[in-house]
A protein has these predicted regions:
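The substrate-binding groove and active-site-proximal loops of carbohydrate-active enzymes
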Residues: 44-48, 73-77, 156-161, 215-220
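His/acidic metal-ligating clusters that form di-metal
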Residues: 57-68, 151-153, 160-254
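Acidic/histidine-rich helix-loop elements
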Residues: 22-53, 110-134, 214-218
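Active-site glycine-centered loops adjacent to acidic/histidine catalytic or metal-binding residues
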Residues: 23, 73-74, 101-102, 185, ...
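Extended active-site neighborhood of metal-dependent phosphoesterases/phosphodiesterases
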Residues: 6-10, 80-179, 207-209, 252-274
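Short, solvent-exposed beta-strand-terminating loops
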Residues: 11-36, 104-108, 178, 182-202
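N-terminal active-site segment of His-dependent metallophosphoesterases
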Residues: 1-84
Length: 275
């Protein structure tokens, strides 16, 4: 696992550091799973061969540094009892703040990732996250934690939407007047990210949606509330950075006209110093 060091300037009284990681994609199963389920996990594990090793590295690095840590979604690849048990122990041991990703809703009932199963997972997402929530200490759909005078806000956007409840809670935090680091799984659309040939953003504009397949439009088209929330996020001076994952690449916004985003990729532990 590589460590990428980033410095951000917020004008805090006392500089501090924290860690961010994302998209570990754990694939644990046990004797309670069917052989077909275990074979599916082995196949998925070939796509994420360092998942368990990365979790161990993070444990050691948090213990060594004492830095707070945020995970921005897809801690597990799909839901199994073994994955949930591991996540509970891992999060409690590291004190990790967790934001849900799109895989925290993934049942994969037919032991495959396909549009039909994914659509079913989306429809029962609230029920699923209610059950998954029991294994995490913070609210994985909306959470706020103050560190060093900065509000760390986590919003679950794993369904490519922001709910009215999340939006209202965000506005309440903004009203406190403190600088905000906003953690989400899926990054906001930006021309920079589009130039890297990725098509998995929050609130892509209509001109981009016009190039998508019908399935991508179904998955990613933002509703009016989400569009309003994204415009609000872009307009708020107190929201200093959006920090996220999902794309499996490392990226930091360079264009000064775009909202500042930090995207962290697979097998990366980002160490962020706030000054």
């Amino acid at each position: 696992m590589q460590i990428v060091k980033t410095q951000i300037e917020l004008g805090v009284e006392k500089p501090f550091a924290f860690l961010q990681t994302t998209d570990i994609h754990l694939v644990f199963t046990d004797e309670n799973d069917t052989e077909a389920r275990r074979e599916f996990a082995r196949a998925r594990g070939r796509d994420f061969p360092h998942a368990e090793e990365n979790a161990a590295f993070i444990r050691q690095y948090v213990a060594k540094t004492g830095y707070p840590i945020v995970h921005t979604g897809d801690l597990m690849d799909f839901i199994t009892p073994a994955n949930l048990r591991f996540c509970r122990e891992f999060v409690r041991e590291t004190g990790m703040m967790v934001v849900a990703g799109n895989h925290e809703q993934a049942h994969c009932v037919n032991n495959v990732f396909c549009p039909e199963d994914y659509a079913g997972d989306m429809k029962r997402r609230d029920e699923t996250l209610d059950a998954v929530q029991a294994y995490f200490d913070n609210d994985i759909r909306f959470t706020c934690r103050e560190i060093g005078g900065v509000n760390f806000v986590g919003i679950d956007n794993g369904n490519y939407q922001i709910s009215q409840d999340q939006f209202e809670k965000l506005k309440t935090v903004v009203a406190e007047g403190k600088p905000i680091l906003l953690f989400m799984h899926i990054p906001l659309y930006s021309k920079e990210l589009q130039a890297r040939h990725y098509d998995c953003y929050l609130a892509p504009p209509e001109v981009v949606l016009a190039t998508y397949t019908p399935w991508q439009v179904y998955e990613q088209k933002a509703d009016e509330r989400t569009l309003e929330a994204c415009a609000y996020i872009r307009s708020q001076e107190l929201i200093k950075y959006v920090i996220c994952g999902h794309l499996h690449l490392d990226h930091e916004t360079q264009d000064p006209t775009e909202i500042r985003q930090i995207v962290t990729g697979l097998d990366t532990l980002r160490e962020i110093t706030v000054v």
